[in-house]
Amino acid sequence: MACKVKAELEAAFKKLDANGDGYVTALELQTFMVTLDAYKALSKDKVKEASAKLIKMADKNSDGKISKEEFLNANAELLCQLK
């Protein structure tokens, strides 16, 4: 992964990790998602469902949260698929 992209993704993870514990939880993800126009029109239940799906996709060790490593790996995988 290119250094610039990695730095941008690390900055994004830091914003998502609201309490700074090194993990993004479903609640942190939901809190962020409702600030985005794409999610504002959705009900709370739909946002909760979307965050659960995102966590499931990235959470490789099935602990219910996304570590920085899992976040970086999921984004790297996605970016490779899009190229």
UniProtKB/Swiss-Prot annotation:
An example Gene Ontology CC term for this record: cytoplasm
Tissue localization of expression: Selectively expressed in a small group of neurons.
Keyword Metal-binding: yes
Location of the protein in the cell: Cytoplasm
Location of the EF-hand domain: 4-39, 46-81
InterPro entries referenced in this protein's UniProt entry, alphabetically: EF-hand-dom_pair, EF_Hand_1_Ca_BS, EF_hand_dom
UniProt xrefs under Pfam families: EF-hand_7
Positions that bind Ca(2+) 2: D59, N61, D63, K65, E70
GO MF annotation list: calcium ion binding
Coiled coil location: none
Residues reported in the UniProt entry to bind Ca(2+) 1: D17, N19, D21, Y23, E28
Keywords attached to this entry: Calcium, Cytoplasm, Metal-binding, Repeat
Keyword Repeat: yes
Function recorded in the entry: May function as a trigger protein which interacts with a larger protein. May mediate calcium-dependent signal transduction events in the growth cones and axons of a small group of sensory neurons which fasciculate in a single axon tract.
Protein name from the UniProt record: Calsensin
